[in-house]
């Protein structure tokens, strides 16, 4: 689960990380009122969407007067903000963060994330703050430093100091940078985050260290322990079909292709998508019905896939272990009839009650294309949609 920048900073402040003063608003008048309350001579008007690259897309503007605050807020609020992370369709801006200006002397990058290779927490830091960290990793990987933290020990002062000095924090501000890093780590651990990123972490002229921007992702499997974080969820920022799928315990992610995929098991689902690509087409979605699929779940899965106008065909790939093939077959037939399926449908099923499942499909009276292997299934659906 993702949250907005203003919510991420609220979390950081709770853990003692210093951030600029700012106010969240959803209106132009609210933006002006926020600037008046903040005082000063310079403000930042920031679009709040669940994507990076907002500045390059025109979603972050400096204002040197209240009139400019009003103008920028009016321009940004309601705009369809396109960044390298949103895709060409962009995301509508419904929220703003109005912040006081900052005396930026230097920008750094810091983040905490799980490193599966070492089974530890990786604390990353770079002197190249304010940039897309993927670009830094590609062009100058030597500028990214890492410390691997044993969760049973925690981030030590020595590790934090190594990072702070390694990215060039002035000696007079090292202690403050160490404090920020340790607080970020604590926040990451205690909230069950999968990513806690500050980009940039800035050095001000007075030597203070502040989090100028922040991004958090949370492990959805741990949200039951954090109702206060669940309250941050903004459904307007999420894909409507993914929200609908979650109501039926379907793992669904929309993609850009034209072949809908209905599979049981995440690994098989990814292998199915890979096979479709191997045979020259693109999957329209990832959809895992899980091991307890019912006729209702399969029907809803079909409805969700077919909401996408790009879907020109559907591939069902089932391995009957916990999930019995006849159950899936019954669901597929019922779903196809209920939605008046008009696109090609290829079904490949193996495992428990396989023969019964194939019999149900064959006797359904529907133009279902059967396949025995993944390669055959992919070949047939790719040919059918061309």
Curated annotation (Swiss-Prot):
One matching Pfam family: ATP-grasp_2
Magnesium found in the keyword field: yes
Known EC number: 6.2.1.5
Entry binding sites for Mg(2+): 199, 213
Limits of the ATP-grasp domain: 9-244
Binding site for substrate: 264, 321-323
Pathway(s) per entry: Carbohydrate metabolism; tricarboxylic acid cycle; succinate from succinyl-CoA (ligase route): step 1/1
Cellular component terms (Gene Ontology): cytosol; succinate-CoA ligase complex
Keyword Magnesium applies: yes
GO terms of molecular function: ATP binding; magnesium ion binding; succinate-CoA ligase (ADP-forming) activity; succinate-CoA ligase (GDP-forming) activity
An example Gene Ontology biological process: succinyl-CoA metabolic process
Source organism superkingdom: Bacteria
Cofactor note: Binds 1 Mg(2+) ion per subunit.
Enzyme's top EC category: ligase
Cofactor (UniProt): Mg(2+)
Catalytic activity annotation: succinate + ATP + CoA = succinyl-CoA + ADP + phosphate; GTP + succinate + CoA = succinyl-CoA + GDP + phosphate
Family: Belongs to the succinate/malate CoA ligase beta subunit family.
Family annotation (PANTHER family): SUCCINATE--COA LIGASE [GDP-FORMING] SUBUNIT BETA, MITOCHONDRIAL, SUCCINYL-COA SYNTHETASE BETA CHAIN
Function of the protein: Succinyl-CoA synthetase functions in the citric acid cycle (TCA), coupling the hydrolysis of succinyl-CoA to the synthesis of either ATP or GTP and thus represents the only step of substrate-level phosphorylation in the TCA. The beta subunit provides nucleotide specificity of the enzyme and binds the substrate succinate, while the binding sites for coenzyme A and phosphate are found in the alpha subunit.
Protein name, UniProt field: Succinate--CoA ligase [ADP-forming] subunit beta
Source organism of this protein record: Aromatoleum aromaticum (strain DSM 19018 / LMG 30748 / EbN1) (Azoarcus sp. (strain EbN1))
């Amino acid at each position: 689960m993702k949250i907005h920048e203003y919510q991420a900073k609220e979390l950081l402040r709770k853990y003692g990380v210093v951030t600029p003063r700012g106010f969240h608003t959803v209106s132009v008048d609210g933006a002006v009122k926020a600037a008046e309350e903040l005082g000063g001579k310079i403000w930042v008007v920031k679009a709040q969407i669940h994507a990076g690259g907002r500045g390059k897309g025109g979603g972050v503007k400096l204002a040197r007067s209240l009139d400019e605050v009003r103008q920028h807020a009016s321009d940004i609020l309601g705009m369809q903000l396109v960044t390298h992370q949103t895709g060409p369709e962009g995301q509508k801006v419904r929220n703003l963060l109005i912040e006081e200006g900052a005396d930026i002397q230097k920008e750094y990058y810091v983040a905490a994330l799980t490193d599966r290779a070492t089974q530890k927490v990786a604390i990353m830091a770079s002197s190249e703050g304010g940039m897309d960290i993927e670009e830094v990793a590609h062009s100058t990987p030597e500028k990214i430093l890492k410390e691997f933290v044993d969760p049973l020990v925690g981030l030590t002062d020595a590790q934090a100091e190594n990072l702070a000095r390694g990215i060039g924090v002035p000696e007079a501000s090292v202690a403050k940078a160490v404090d920020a890093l340790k607080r970020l780590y604590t926040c990451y651990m205690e909230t069950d985050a999968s990513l806690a990123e500050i980009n940039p972490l800035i050095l001000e002229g007075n030597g203070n260290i502040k989090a100028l921007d922040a991004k958090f992702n949370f492990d959805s499997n741990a949200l039951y322990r954090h109702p206060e974080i669940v309250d941050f969820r903004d459904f307007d920022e999420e894909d409507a079909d993914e929200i609908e799928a979650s109501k039926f315990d379907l793992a669904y992610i929309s993609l850009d292709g034209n072949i809908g995929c209905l599979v049981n098991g995440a690994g098989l689902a990814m292998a199915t998508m890979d096979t479709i690509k191997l045979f020259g087409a693109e999957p329209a979605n990832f959809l895992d019905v899980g091991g307890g699929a019912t006729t209702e779940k399969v029907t809803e899965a079909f409805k969700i896939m077919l909401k996408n106008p790009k879907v020109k065909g559907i591939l069902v790939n089932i391995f009957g272990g916990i999930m019995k093939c006849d159950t899936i077959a019954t669901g597929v037939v019922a779903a196809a009839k209920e939605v008046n399926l008009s696109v090609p449908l290829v079904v490949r099923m193996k495992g428990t009650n396989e023969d019964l499942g194939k019999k149900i499909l064959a006797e359904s009276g529907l133009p279902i294309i059967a396949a025995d292997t993944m390669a055959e299934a992919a070949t047939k659906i790719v040919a059918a949609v061309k």
